[in-house]
Amino acid sequence: MFAKIQSYKPALDLLNQVDADVITFETRSSGALDLEAIGRQITEKKVGIGVIDHHTLQVESPEEVAGDIRAALRHVPAERLILCSDCGMGREGMSRRHAYYKMVSLVLGTNLVRKELGLPQADCLAADPKFSLIRTT
């Protein structure tokens, strides 16, 4: 349905030379294809790693997001790692509700890893059942 996934490897040396503080990569939709190479070659910049796929309406579970974060931490130091979506959520057919739940999963997945690392967790009122958009009673 989508074009063949392209490797970032041929561009990494040039991206490392770009006058920017952060370089972002679509890694969720590629199955983390180049994550090891990104961590090895992008050494002086912060690295944004996509842990949410904008190509699909399927909402990632917090556990899936946490798995992607753990994989990223094997290659990119935590102090240079930024977690993000692969791209914006403006694709045709992506409702605000889908984007909302995808971002909630990003926060909850991040909190799973932060807890494992003994770091403080971020409040996520959107995941609190009392603020749910879905009627439960």
Regions found by a protein language model. Name each.
Residues M1-T137:
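Domain-level signal for soluble alpha/beta catalytic cores
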